[in-house]
């Protein structure tokens, strides 16, 4: 090993401010990951719907019970909100809008919440079978948890959203 020490050596920064550049890259990645999360949530909803239509209890499909309908409807609402916010992020990304940080954080937060919610509800609708390895519910749950931590926690993205809105004097 060698150690090099510079003392009173002239230095010149290369490139732009590193932190701003890193946040811009994370904003771009957040928009792309949001679409992956929306896609995963859609599959979880479809799996839950198909199972609810096929599974019968007390002589009728469990999809006919109001509690199951409400769960499926709640999943659908969260997914559509996440999709809309992801499109907003994609729009901001496509034109390099000044509001990219707001759009990316909005897409990230809503898509993470939608995917986590849909993957959990999918397991619940599958009942005991949702906890087994026979169905792929666990794969979507684990992927939702992994993507929730990619690029930072949900708390961090919510804080970024608040800071971005404060900078715009919206909050």
Where are these predicted regions, by residue range?
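Short helix/loop capping segments that flank catalytic or ligand/cofactor-binding pockets
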Residues: 13-15, 42
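Alpha-helical interface subdomain recognition
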Residues: 24-171
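Flexible, small-/acidic-enriched active-site or ligand-binding loops
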Residues: 1-13, 21
């Amino acid at each position: 090993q060698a150690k090099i020490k510079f003392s009173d050596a002239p230095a010149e920064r290369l490139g732009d401010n590193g932190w701003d550049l890193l946040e811009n890259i994370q904003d771009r990645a957040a928009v792309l990951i949001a679409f992956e999360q929306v896609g995963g949530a859609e599959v979880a909803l479809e799996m839950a719907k198909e199972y609810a239509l096929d599974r019968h209890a007390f002589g009728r499909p469990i999809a006919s019970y109001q509690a199951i309908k409400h769960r499926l409807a709640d999943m659908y609402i969260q997914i559509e909100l996440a999709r809309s916010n992801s499109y907003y992020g994609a729009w901001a990304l496509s034109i390099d809008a000044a509001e990219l940080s707001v759009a990316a954080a909005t897409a990230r937060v809503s898509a993470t919440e939608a995917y986590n919610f849909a993957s959990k509800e999918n397991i619940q609708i599958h009942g005991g079978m949702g906890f087994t390895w026979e169905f792929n519910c666990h794969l979507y749950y684990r992927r939702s948890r992994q993507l929730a931590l990619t690029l930072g926690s949900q708390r961090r993205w919510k804080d970024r959203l608040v800071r971005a809105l404060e900078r715009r004097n919206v909050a």
